[in-house]
């Protein structure tokens, strides 16, 4: 079994959902980012979703765009992010790790070379945010060749064909988007049809569903689980803690620890 499959099986046995924080790698620096990620795992994160710094992110709202800019301004490259991933994997051999990134970052390195490096540093899954199902072919094939699980997004306006395609092609987990738009901790409105989408994804045997976008409070984690999802992903709310504590790293780590503990408690 993959790390994601093992983790979901473990959580199911305990009747728990998954809490998965997102942060941008190398934000604000390589060393601080490593300490931040360690804090997330040590305080209860069930898996990690991590982003590479990129100057033109597709789905990212202002909070995560600012995180990208901080890492880029500090001079960090995609190779730095890969080295950081390797360091994280070395310390945490069991934690499932997924990447959320844009296709240009993969193109820059070359499809085969990128997925090969992901495998070398211990990445489990990759979600390419701007690759539609219709263009999935080479990505899915190359990912699987290197033992990387491809993940796809199910948008709130997905039709039957899209739902079926997402369910069929996703491995590890399925990313259910709460609403249209970009990531934000402020916009916590969710589409009204999420329960129907969850039912349909399950009917097509989709891998465990994680709900993302606008997950900032424990109540929203509980709400996601009540819809039948396997857990929730929180990006902007996590990164906002980093943003407001740039001048006080110890305070940043303390707030992140409390946040993860609180969000994880909501999965039980």
Swiss-Prot record:
Top EC group: lyase
Catalytic activity: (1S,2R)-1-C-(indol-3-yl)glycerol 3-phosphate + L-serine = D-glyceraldehyde 3-phosphate + L-tryptophan + H2O
Pathway it works in: Amino-acid biosynthesis; L-tryptophan biosynthesis; L-tryptophan from chorismate: step 5/5
Residues the record marks as active site: 49 (proton acceptor), 60 (proton acceptor)
Key words, A-Z: Amino-acid biosynthesis, Aromatic amino acid biosynthesis, Lyase, Tryptophan biosynthesis
Subunit structure: Tetramer of two alpha and two beta chains.
Name of the protein in its database record: Tryptophan synthase alpha chain
Organism: Haemophilus influenzae (strain ATCC 51907 / DSM 11121 / KW20 / Rd)
């Amino acid at each position: 079994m993959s790390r994601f499959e093992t983790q979901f099986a473990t959580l199911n046995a305990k009747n728990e959902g998954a809490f998965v924080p997102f942060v941008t790698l190398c934000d604000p620096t390589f060393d601080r980012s490593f300490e931040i990620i360690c804090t997330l795992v040590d305080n209860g994160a069930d898996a990690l979703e991590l982003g590479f710094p990129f100057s033109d992110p597709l789905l990212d709202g202002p909070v995560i765009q600012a995180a990208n800019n901080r890492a880029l301004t500090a001079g960090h490259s995609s190779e730095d992010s890969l080295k950081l991933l390797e360091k994280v994997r070395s310390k945490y051999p069991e934690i499932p790790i997924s990447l959320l990134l844009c296709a240009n970052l993969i193109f820059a390195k070359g499809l085969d070379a990128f997925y090969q490096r992901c495998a070398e540093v211990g990445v489990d899954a990759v979600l390419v945010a701007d690759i539609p199902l219709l263009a999935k072919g080479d990505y899915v094939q190359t990912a699987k060749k290197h033992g990387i699980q491809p993940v796809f997004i199910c948008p709130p306006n997905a039709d039957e064909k899209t739902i079926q395609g997402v369910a069929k092609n996703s491995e590890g987990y399925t990313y259910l988007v709460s609403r249209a738009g970009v990531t934000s901790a402020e916009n916590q409105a969710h589409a009204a049809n999420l329960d129907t989408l969850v039912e349909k994804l399950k009917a097509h045997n989709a891998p465990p569903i994680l709900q993302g976008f606008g997950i900032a409070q424990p109540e929203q984690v509980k709400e996601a689980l009540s819809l039948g999802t396997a857990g929730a992903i929180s990006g902007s709310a996590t990164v906002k803690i980093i943003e407001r504590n740039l001048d006080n790293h110890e305070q940043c780590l303390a707030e992140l620890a409390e946040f993860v503990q609180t969000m994880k408690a909501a999965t039980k």
